[in-house]
Structure formats: C-alpha cells, structure tokens
C-alpha cells in the first residue's frame, strides 16, 4: 500500500483540500508559515507569489501554484511530486 502524503493547502482552496482528502492524503490548512513544516508539498493560490514565506525554504517539498489549474490538474501535480 502506498503511503499518502501530508499536503499543505492554502485555506481558500477548499475544493483542492476536499479532493486530496478523498484521495487519502493528510491535508493541513495553511494559515501561517509554521503550518507548512512537515508537509511533503504545499498548494498555494499563486495570487501572492511568496504567500506567508512558503516559497522560501520553509518546507522540504514542492510548492505547487494552483493559479490557472483545475482541481484535477492540481491533484495530478501533487501525485507527480509526492
């Protein structure tokens, strides 16, 4: 069985949060930079290119920008990076 990832998702992306939970991932809502710690990757809206400093090296994994992507496309990005 595949180990599911811990994904940080910006709080305005509720559709992405729900889709990732349905896939079995652990989803953490990103309200501050500390929320990103321990996440395998983070999904942000991209409206603020450095949302809460998460684009910095505060996480070990990828930062996925959801701007212009569908929920399915974001989920595919998560799958390919975790």
Swiss-Prot record:
Pfam families: UPF0180
InterPro entries tied to this protein: UPF0180
Lineage top rank: taxon: Bacteria
Family of this protein: Belongs to the UPF0180 family.
Name assigned to this protein: UPF0180 protein BT9727_1277
UniProt organism field: Bacillus thuringiensis subsp. konkukian (strain 97-27)
């Amino acid at each position: 069985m595949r180990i599911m990832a811990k994904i940080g998702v910006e709080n305005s992306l509720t559709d992405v949060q729900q889709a990732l939970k349905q896939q079995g991932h652990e989803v953490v809502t990103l309200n501050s930079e500390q929320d990103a710690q321990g996440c395998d990757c983070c999904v942000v809206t991209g409206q603020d290119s450095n949302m809460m400093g998460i684009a910095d090296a505060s996480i070990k994994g990828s930062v996925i920008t959801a701007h212009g992507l569908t929920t399915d496309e974001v989920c595919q990005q998560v799958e390919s990076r975790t």
